[in-house]
Amino acid sequence: MSDFAFFALEALIKCIIIIAIFASLAGLATYAERKVLAYFQRRIGPDMVGPFGLIQLVADMIKLFTKEDIIPSNSQKFIFAIAPLISAICAFVSLAAIPMLPEFTLFGRVIQPIVADINVALLFVIGTSGLCFYAVFLGGLASNNKWSILGAARGLVAIISYESVGALALIAIVMLVGSFSLVDINNYQSDGFFSWLIFKQPLAFVLFIIALFIETNRTPLCLTENDAEIVAGYGTEYSGLRWGMFFIGEYASMIAGAILVTLLFLGGFNGFWIIPGWIMMIVKSSFIFFWYFWARAAFPQLRPDQVMKMCYLILIPLAVVNLLITALAVLL
């Protein structure tokens, strides 16, 4: 087999594996979230369908796929129809440049668990994952429903504001490492526990986590939907499989965000002591992913004015100060 044919086959297999694994993980994440929230609320959670309620996932999938797909008569039908697809596609495309695990050898060839190892991977991931919100915005506007439009507008204001917070936090990381490559950022932290960037950039870590909650529409910083204020927000008019596509895209973005935090701040897939790198990657990413559930269970939903004041009066000034301190440290 020629090198090009092997490369093409390898890339195709990687794409199929990523889509299959992360679509499945999105379903498992819903089960995990329900169990975690039940524990916080002193309930049991799903436990009737299958052992430990695991088959509840299949039941939910059947229910979702067999629901009637309704398109409102006064909506912008084409945009309304494709918006959920944009959400899922952008979420999966952003995973293409994220290195998942350490490289390994298969059939005498070195395999890198990444679809495209590009030297501007960080820009690519942030850019494509940011496009996911266009699906939310377009879906809300195309629905021609006042709650959907309000949810889309609130989310647009938040995402524009908090993208600045996340970008300023990441610039500090790039200044230290000197590269936009996620592989280079991972390798920068390969000298042991205290080489992790969370110790050199603790403020950037906090700022990026907060921006990530806005990016993934998670409580307590989610402005696109609120049962007490705007019902389901942008998704009020969606049902069936189209709603499921939004759902899969959101959870895939959450998983990608957890992996990205691990790569940027927590040592990536570098091994620790006798623990292999791939185990460390899974454990650390799972821990970050758990924070989504913990925050939803522990904190109340913030009002839009509180979210925006926190951004412009606290977070952006802190991000700028952190950037200036990092620049001085690099120069000196």
UniProtKB/Swiss-Prot annotation:
Enzyme nomenclature, EC number: 7.1.1.-
Enzyme class, spelled out: translocase
Residue ranges of the TM segments: 4-24, 44-64, 78-98, 120-140, 165-185, 194-214, 255-275, 279-299, 312-332
The reaction(s) this protein catalyses: a quinone + NADH + 5 H(+)(in) = a quinol + NAD(+) + 4 H(+)(out)
Pfam family of the protein (one): NADHdh
Keyword Translocase: yes
InterPro entries in UniProt: NADH_UbQ_OxRdtase_su1/FPO, NADH_UbQ_OxRdtase_su1_CS
GO cellular component, one term: plasma membrane
Cellular location(s): Cell inner membrane
Keyword Iron (UniProt): no
Primary location: membrane
Membrane topology type: Multi-pass membrane protein
Keywords attached to this entry: Cell inner membrane, Cell membrane, Membrane, NAD, Quinone, Translocase, Transmembrane, Transmembrane helix, Ubiquinone
Gene Ontology MF: a single term: NADH dehydrogenase activity
GO biological process, one term: aerobic respiration
Function: NDH-1 shuttles electrons from NADH, via FMN and iron-sulfur (Fe-S) centers, to quinones in the respiratory chain. The immediate electron acceptor for the enzyme in this species is believed to be ubiquinone. Couples the redox reaction to proton translocation (for every two electrons transferred, four hydrogen ions are translocated across the cytoplasmic membrane), and thus conserves the redox energy in a proton gradient. This subunit may bind ubiquinone.
Family listed: Belongs to the complex I subunit 1 family.
Subunit structure: NDH-1 is composed of 14 different subunits. Subunits NuoA, H, J, K, L, M, N constitute the membrane sector of the complex.
Database matches in HAMAP family: NDH1_NuoH
NCBIfam families: PRK06076.1-2
Protein name: NADH-quinone oxidoreductase subunit H
Native source organism of the sequence: Campylobacter jejuni subsp. doylei (strain ATCC BAA-1458 / RM4099 / 269.97)
Lineage of the species this protein comes from: Bacteria, Pseudomonadati, Campylobacterota, Epsilonproteobacteria, Campylobacterales
